[in-house]
Amino acid sequence: ANTALDMDKIIVGRYKIGTSARQVNPRALGTQNNNWSNQTSASRGGFNAEIAELSNLRGDVKTRTIFKPTNGSSVPDLKLHWDADRLMFSMVDTDRRWQVFEVKLDGTGLKKLIETPEKDLEFFDATYLPSGKLIAVSNIGYNGVPCVNGNDEVGNMCLYDPKDGSLRRLTFDQDANWAPTVMNNGRIMYTRWEYTDLTHYFSRFVMHMNPDGTEQKSLYGSGSYFPNSTFD
């Protein structure tokens, strides 16, 4: 009866977790461990994960593997390209650092999307822009979350141009940003941990901005009591 299944196929991140399916938490699925951290705090190996295509959703569901890491990485942050012929995702590289990769839906053409000479930079939670550029969350500030003594790195957003390799930081927040998403009007919606005008200790508000990082404004949740946190 679920009308969301009235389609030919869907693309999913698939994790084979055996008999512990009813007990898993975010750590077991390769994502951040709590509501203030980001992908740099997630486990970097030991997963049996893949990107898969599911079809025949109303009958005997068929599964086709699109991509499976050989290094035990998880495959979070799936984002389909506008042309629907490829997708981006996050995965650890050979140096065990998070990077943004792209693969075609037929499983070919795997490549890293963001190239930078700064080897300590990590990128994840990215999105395609209509201009051909990318926005990704990164540890570019090299700072930690203050209320946990810096034990979790802060992720702020960057703008990357694949044509010339230019990288520009867009946000300079004390705490993390998550889930940049292109809105119908071309602006970027995202969530941000907020310490200003908060009514709760744990506050994640929905923000929006222009793709170049200008006009960062609250979209939903600023000053409200409930819900006190939003997620992607």
Q: What do the predicted segments below correspond to?
A:
Residues 1-58, 70-80:
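Beta-strand-rich domains and repeat architectures in extracellular enzymes and scaffolds
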Residues 6, 47, 74-76, 83, ...:
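Beta-rich catalytic cores
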Residues 7-8, 83-85, 131-133, 185-187:
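Short coil/turn segments that connect the beta-strands within blades of beta-propeller domains
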Residues 15-46, 92-93, 97, 136-153, ...:
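Short, conserved, GDST-rich strand-edge loop motifs in beta-rich repeat architectures
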Residues 43, 50-52, 99-101, 156-158, ...:
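A short loop-to-beta-strand structural motif that recurs across blades of beta-propeller domains
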Residues 58-73, 104-122, 160-175, 210-229:
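Multi-bladed beta-propeller domains
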Residues 96-178:
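Asp-box/WD-like beta-propeller blade repeats and closely related beta-sheet repeat scaffolds
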